[in-house]
Every structure is written in C-alpha cells, then in structure tokens.
C-alpha cells in the first residue's frame, strides 16, 4: 500500500483492510509516520512523537472496530501515561510535565484498537482556534 491508497479510506475502511489481512497495522503506521515526517516541518502539527510506543502497539494483537488504525491525539486534556502533557503552555513544557496515567478518552481510543503515534500542537489551554 502507498499513501495515495491509504488516504482513500476512512478509519473504518483502514480497519477493514487490517482485519482482512490486506495490510498490517505496522504498515499503516509506517505510512502515517512517513507522511507526518514529510509535512510536519511546514505545519508544526506534531509536537510529541510517540513512534516507538506506537510501533510496539501496532506489532501486538489489536482488537476493536478501529484495530490497527493510526491516530494523532491533541495535547489537550487527552493524557497519555508517560507522555508530555503541556496543553500549549510554555511553563508546563519547561517544567517537563508528564502524564501519570491515560485519560478515560485515551483508554477508550485504545480499547477501540487505535494506535496513537503522537501528540499534536494546541493553543494554550485550548483558548484560541489557532496555534502560533
């Protein structure tokens, strides 16, 4: 599969490809990571890559309606155990704040089989509709 084929599918379509064995979760993740690495220098969207943890998860047994589908999580109230959690705040970033546990939303995403491979930029505490 290449990225042009990947982008033709929504999340359920990608999950169906994984379930049928046409593509693996690891292959989808590799495509998603490659695309983010290509566009992120221009967008500054990905601020906390979690590629290694995502590769481990994608290589395991995944279940749920979105099993094997790569996803990015906003760095805003979606805590992931052991990952930076700054909510766009420079003070929290300088202090090196890390989440102690997964939020309920992250637990549900993971139970649905999603493979979170990074955290994305956010305006400070979500107060604006744009990031700088």
What is each model feature region?
Residues 1-48:
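An N-terminal boundary/leader segment
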Residues 3-7, 63-69:
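Flexible N-terminal pre-Rossmann segment of NAD(P)-dependent oxidoreductases
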Residues 15, 61, 106-107:
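Short glycine-/small-residue-rich flexible loop motifs, especially phosphate/cofactor-binding loops
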Residues 35-36, 54, 125-128:
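Short secondary-structure boundary/hinge segments and terminal tails
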Residues 52-59, 110-114:
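Long amphipathic alpha-helix in the N-terminal Rossmann-like dinucleotide-binding domain
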Residues 58-62, 78:
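Glycine-rich loop at the start of a catalytic domain that most often binds anionic cofactors/ligands
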Residues 67-132:
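Short glycine/serine-rich loop/turn segments
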């Amino acid at each position: 599969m290449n990225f042009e084929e990947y982008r033709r599918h929504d999340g359920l379509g990608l999950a169906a490809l994984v379930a049928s064995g046409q593509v693996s979760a690891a292959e989808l993740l590799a495509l998603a990571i490659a695309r983010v690495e290509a566009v992120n220098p221009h967008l500054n969207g990905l601020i906390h890559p979690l590629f290694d943890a995502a590769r481990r998860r994608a290589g395991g047994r995944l279940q749920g309606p979105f099993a094997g589908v790569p996803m990015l999580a906003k760095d805003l109230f979606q805590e992931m155990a052991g990952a930076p959690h700054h909510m766009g705040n420079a003070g929290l970033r300088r202090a090196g704040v890390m989440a102690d546990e997964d939020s309920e939303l992250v637990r549900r995403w993971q139970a649905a089989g999603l493979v979170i491979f990074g955290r994305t930029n956010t305006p400070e505490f979500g107060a604006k509709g744009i990031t700088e």
